[in-house]
């Protein structure tokens, strides 16, 4: 442009800042570019500053974005709904809802008309905070202003109810209300509903919702599959868990670490150690390396599947992968051996746990003590001795150190000794 003697203006500048943001340039780069353009005569404008604020907000630099908005207002450039929405969204996503509410109040006080996006930003924030009653009020306020709630508005409401165990029916009701007013559900809406059923323990309804979704031609996402898998993990239905996982693989949907842990835990808790191994193998193909948590769940699978003799081998595998066993690893092994009344091995791994400095938290310790106290009623003297060895050791929990002696009493004792020597002399 400049070689052809064409001077860039504020529109050119705002487009360039947007392109820079999308190409991965930092907010600092965008600010420096704007300053260069400003020196060349490009003035401050709503378009330019809106693009700059977006760049800063995307990097989480909310306070800096707020300073730019403040400077903009000082120069007589009023913020519009887009600028306010950008700022509110940044604060909401950082769980700073009070600041977002403050901007919402300022926006209305200055006569800037909120949009559907404005309300959806607040609804999304309150959804994450599990406050459906506030979302219900925002929906009413929105309608009073002549704005129609959309699919995102209702999805926030479904999600807010669905995150709470005893409100799954309210989530289902919100879903029906949405359909009643003619709004078509999206993948996000169905995922929120499936998650609600999962949390509420209604795994059959979760699967029905999944089937309805597919019937309506809506493609399930990884979030949908993860929510559905979690429903059947909670229900302990490993057969359907495997079926859903196979469906996911046939749809060529790659799992996440959350999906991996849900599947592994689901099979482990029912003692399906072969399936648990399959999960580790399949997810290993897409780069998910086993962690200490992975091995803890795998040990649980082998223990519950009656394969406690394989646990030492798993411990060796961990060492070969440079994974350090934690208190949960050792507790899992101790539980496994106590379950089959192999108290000697339980005591051995308890000693290993204490030796390695891996001490369970007080709650886990109390749980283990209560189990061992019951087992200590055994008539076998050797077994009883091994159990009491664990119980009485306080599981390696640190004993409170004695307080430092007061110097006065230390000297007093010394003085007595001196006096006694003097008398003896």
What do these predicted ranges mean?
Residues 33, 68, 103, 138, ...:
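Alpha-helical solenoid repeat scaffolds, predominantly canonical TPR units
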Residues 27, 62, 97, 132, ...:
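TPR-repeat structural position
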Residues 2-18, 22-32, 36-47, 60-66, ...:
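N-terminal targeting peptides
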Residues 343-360, 373, 384-396:
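TPR/TPR-like (Sel1-like) alpha-helical repeat modules
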Residues 21-22, 57, 71, 92, ...:
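Non-globular disordered terminal and juxtamembrane segments underlying protein topogenesis/assembly
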């Amino acid at each position: 442009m400049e070689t052809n003697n064409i001077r860039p203006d504020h529109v050119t500048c705002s487009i360039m800042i947007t392109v820079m943001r999308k190409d991965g340039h930092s907010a600092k780069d965008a600010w420096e570019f704007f300053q260069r353009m400003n020196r060349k005569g490009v003035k401050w404008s709503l378009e330019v500053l809106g693009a700059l604020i977006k760049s800063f907000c995307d990097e989480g630099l909310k306070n800096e974005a707020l300073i730019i908005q403040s400077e903009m207002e000082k120069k007589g450039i009023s913020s519009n709904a887009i600028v306010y929405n950008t700022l509110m969204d940044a604060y909401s996503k950082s769980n700073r809802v009070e600041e977002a509410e403050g901007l919402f109040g300022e926006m209305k006080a200055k006569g800037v008309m909120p949009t559907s996006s404005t309300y959806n930003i607040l609804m999304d924030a309150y959804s994450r905070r599990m406050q459906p009653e506030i979302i219900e009020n925002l929906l009413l306020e929105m309608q009073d202003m002549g704005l129609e709630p959309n699919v995102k508005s209702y999805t926030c409401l479904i999600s807010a109810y669905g995150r709470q165990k005893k409100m799954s029916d309210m989530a289902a009701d919100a879903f029906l209300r949405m359909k009643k007013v003619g709004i078509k559900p999206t993948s996000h809406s169905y995922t929120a509903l499936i998650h609600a059923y999962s949390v509420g323990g209604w795994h059959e309804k979760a699967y029905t919702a999944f089937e309805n979704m597919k019937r309506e031609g809506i493609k399930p996402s990884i979030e949908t599959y993860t929510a559905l898998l979690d429903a059947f993990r909670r229900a302990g239905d490993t057969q359907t868990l495997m079926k859903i996982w196979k469906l996911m693989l046939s749809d060529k949907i790659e799992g996440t670490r959350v999906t991996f842990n849900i599947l592994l835990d689901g099979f482990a808790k029912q003692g399906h150690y072969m399936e648990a191994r399959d999960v580790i193998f399949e997810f290993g193909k897409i780069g998910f390396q086993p962690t200490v948590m992975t091995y803890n769940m795998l040990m649980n699978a082998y223990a519950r599947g009656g394969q406690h003799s394989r646990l030492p081998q798993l411990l060796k595998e961990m060492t070969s992968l440079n994974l350090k066993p934690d208190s949960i690893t050792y507790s899992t092994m101790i539980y496994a051996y106590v379950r089959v009344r192999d108290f000697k091995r339980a005591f051995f791994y308890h000693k290993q746990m204490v030796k390695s400095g891996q001490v369970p938290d007080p709650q886990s310790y109390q749980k283990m003590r209560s189990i061992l106290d019951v087992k200590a009623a055994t008539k076998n003297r050797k077994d009883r001795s091994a159990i009491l060895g664990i119980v009485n050791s306080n599981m390696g929990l640190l004993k409170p150190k004695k307080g430092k002696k007061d110097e006065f009493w230390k000297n007093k004792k010394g003085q007595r000794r001196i006096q006694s020597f003097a008398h003896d002399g």
